[in-house]
Amino acid sequence: MTLASIRRGYHVIKTLLQYGLDDVLPPKMTPWYFTLARNSLFWIRNKHKDKSGGERLKLAMQELGPVYIKLGQMLSTRRDLLSDEWATELAMLQDKVPPFDGALARLAIEAELKAPIETFFDDFNETPLASASISQVHTATLKSNGKAVVLKVLRPNVETKIQADLLLMSQTAKVIDYLLGEGNRLRPAEVIEDYRVTILGELNLKLEALNAIKLRNNFIDSDALYIPYVYEEFCYPRLMVMERIYGIPVSDIVALKAQGTNFKLLAERGVELFFTQVFRDNFFHADMHPGNIFISRENPENPYYIGLDCGIMGTLSEVDKRYLAENFLAFFNRDYHRIAQLYIESGWVSEKTDLQAFEQAIKVVCEPMFNKPLDEISFGHVLLELFRTARHFDIVVQPQLVLLEKTLLYIEGLGRQLYPQLDLWQTAKPFLEQWMAEQVGPKAMFKKVSTKLPYWSDKLPEFPELIYDNLKLGRKLLSSQQQMLDKYLKYQQQAHKSNYLLITSAILLICGTLLFNQDATLLSPYVCLISGAVLWIIGWRSRPKNRKF
């Protein structure tokens, strides 16, 4: 551990103590040596006793900077781990930081291009259009076609700073894991590892560019979603160039109302887009907060979404998709037994789980939701409550399912903000039922066979040889089995004979011993003893030598 990391660790602990966050630790995590270290190394006391624990954590993360802000934002989606109060407070964290010098941005861009900016772009504006904790955006005009573009560039040395903070987080999480012991629900090391994978993915703008290109191609003919064009030839790990868009932020309800936007259609399209990305394309935008979503200015009666920032994308396996769809359908059919079965069948919880106890726990949580009208039931909260319940049965929450839950909560909140009467179930149910119908039956089977056709057509010429080899192997196997059977029968015969002789010898030896104490002829006991000994020797020598068949 370097001096810099020790200094940073001290600063982090000092900040957390300033906000009194040691007060929320359970007693088992504050043994005497912890208290001694706290009082000798840190003489700071809680300066914010008037604030709740969740608010203090939010303020501490805000003060610690971008990496901790992003961690807080991610934790706000883990309501299966945190209380609603804490999660709500962390959701208020804003990834807003002062911009860095435009001259430094120019140097960073030119380092990636390996040429002056003016070689490829005109009108480069050193004043950023927007800035965030990881990157900054500048406007320019493409020299080759005169089109307006934006250049997204990483902050100087951001990778080093993030790696240092991640290392510190990881080490701290392991210590907390150790203090909490086996069976703790928080699993801090697991949470930090998920966060590490997510944030490191955001540090590669080339990967983000490829994600954007793929998402754009998936919706190239869509009238519901537009992804700006990415100029791949100008994309590098620390630089990304894409088409500039001119939309209205989805959070600007006043501007959307002023242009006469069809809010009902917009809200329904948002839900359809989510389920299309998840179930049709298996590739969904997992960072759909309001800052990344804009609405088109033209044709407000037929509005479409404009999606930005494809740094975090989610995918699900075919198995996860199927179980997820069945979960939602089973929930709205109030089939809690099926939900419990699905969690076990999918491997999300152990097959050793008590099915009846799990079903009862799900029923206790889900049944009260039906006291509301269907159009007020939240998909995201259904998924959240199911995960939270399953947590008590040692669920292994997959990172992609956490991303899905977060995205679903964003989409629902957005949809109901745009159109409070949105009936999410009526919008999504036909889509889910159609998708499930496509997964079973003759059409689904034909489709699966069709996708495998090139593979099997390539293997078809090998079939005659494979059949011949298998028949040949079968004959050898039958012959081998017959030999094994013969050996086994011979072994059994030898064993029976040996056992018979040994038992008979034992009887004769016992009889000979008893006859010594009886009024028998002097010869009788000796005949029995000698016969018994001879039979024992013959029986012992006739035992099967081994059991290898």
Swiss-Prot record:
It holds the Pfam family ABC1. CDD domains: UbiB. Keywords: ATP-binding, Cell inner membrane, Cell membrane, Kinase, Membrane, Nucleotide-binding, Transferase, Transmembrane, Transmembrane helix, Ubiquinone biosynthesis. Pathway: Cofactor biosynthesis; ubiquinone biosynthesis [regulation]. SUPFAM superfamilies: Protein kinase-like (PK-like). Its EC number is 2.7.-.-. It is found in: Cell inner membrane. Residues 123-501 form the Protein kinase domain. The active site is at D287. GO terms for molecular function: ATP binding; protein kinase activity. It comes from the Bacteria. GO terms for cellular component: plasma membrane. The chain crosses the membrane at residues 498-518, 520-540. GO terms for biological process: regulation of ubiquinone biosynthetic process; ubiquinone biosynthetic process. ATP binds at L129, A130, S131, A132, S133, I134, S135, Q136, V137, K152. Its main location: membrane. It is a multi-pass membrane protein. Is probably a protein kinase regulator of UbiI activity which is involved in aerobic coenzyme Q (ubiquinone) biosynthesis. Belongs to the ABC1 family. UbiB subfamily. This is Probable protein kinase UbiB.
